[in-house]
Amino acid sequence: MNIPYISRYKINLSSAVVSCAAFVCMSAYPVFSQPAKGANKFLGNITVMSSIRSDYLKYWNQITGENESKWESVERTRDKMSWAGTDRIAKYSRENGIAWKFHCLVWGSQYPGWMNNLSQSEQLEEITEWLDSAAARYPDVQMIDVINEAYPSHKPPPFKNALGGDGSTGYDWMIKIFKMTRDRWPNAVLIYNDYNTIEWGSEVDWQVKMATAMKKNNSEMDAIGVQAHDAWKVATNTVKGNIDKLAATGYPIIVSEYDIGESNDSRQKQIMEEQFTMFWNHPKIVGVTYWGYIVGRTWRNGTGLLNDGGAERPALTWLVDFVKKNPNPPNDYPKLVKMPDDVSVAPHTTYTIISKKADVSGPMQIFNLQGRLSSSRLENSQPMSVVPVNSAHGCYIINYKDMQGGTIKSLR
């Protein structure tokens, strides 16, 4: 299976003319030296009570919404979608050139209660509408938790029979929802996400069995997300051994919701040193998302890393220093986390630049969000590159129609 790039620039081409949009960002946010900036693995976190703090970019180069994108949060009332929270996350990721993950599409916990009153055919219609709405609004999202916590004693969705149920493979409904997601997001990294799958034996074994079946049946699943909420309670060697078991299925691993529920600073730092070092140096792990970082504003006591006033707990100070000093850990799936500035299309292209306020024919030009043309020059080289000149801080859009192809390099 080809693993797609996590990229801000996603272009799907056919023989027909295709309209595309790419973003070039000169951030107006405070400029911080992110620990993982330029590293071959991402270091992420989540929103803080549906907001994004001004110090976010100081520590993290990947973002996940804690609750904003869950189906229940978006469509609490049938056919009334509330996207404001997810819009903020998508905008922030684009403006700052960091990857974001949509969390999550299907989960048997936080889904709209009105789904329980529908027939299976109606449930399938609503699932399809949910995916269609999200895909139309966020076609460029880099990663998606397609299914969350479907281990039998966790929270498999009660509407799974609308997707085919267990079926002949034992996982028919999962294969179907991944296929439906791939049809709408051809370039996103599609993830199965669950907890206890690197901690406790029976759940590790189930995850291995499930992943093996998904691989055998050519599912569209790209990666396994391991939440790792309880990993801090387990010996690091045991955790690593369980990760090795999952990795043997052939899927990349994302540590998706790690936290350390330890109020003692020294103990939290010790665990962080042991376990994060193992995560970062494991060749099958492509990135780590820590689940919350502000003391007193995380879902579990003791997991925070930064006091509200900005004082770092020792574990965070160590983490920042370690990642900065180790930007190129082993990674067997570097393309999964690469965020290139290249925008690739087919060779020998003529472009028409489209804006609300200007239409310009030519190789490419850059517009701000108000549709005003920004200065640029075209270098006479292959692949071509456009260099913004005298551009103020802000987010810029490159809109163009592909006629026959070419490769553009966008510099931010």
Where are these predicted regions, by residue range?
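Residue-level detector of functionally pivotal "anchor" positions at catalytic/ligand-binding pockets or at interdomain
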Residues: 33, 328-362, 368, 409
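Boundary/entry segment of secreted carbohydrate-active catalytic domains
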Residues: 34-68
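Acidic-and-aromatic substrate-binding clefts and catalytic sites of carbohydrate-active enzymes
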Residues: 44-55, 71-84, 111, 151-155, ...
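Substrate-binding cleft and catalytic face of glycoside hydrolase catalytic domains
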Residues: 58-76, 84-199, 262
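Aromatic-rich peripheral "rim/lid" segments of glycoside hydrolase catalytic domains that contact
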Residues: 75-76, 145, 149-167, 180, ...
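Glycoside hydrolase catalytic-domain groove-lining segments
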Residues: 77, 82-99, 167-190, 204-266, ...
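C-terminal tail/sorting-segment detector
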Residues: 334-338, 351, 376, 390-412
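Short, glycine-anchored, charge-dense loop/turn motifs used at functional sites
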Residues: 366-374, 396
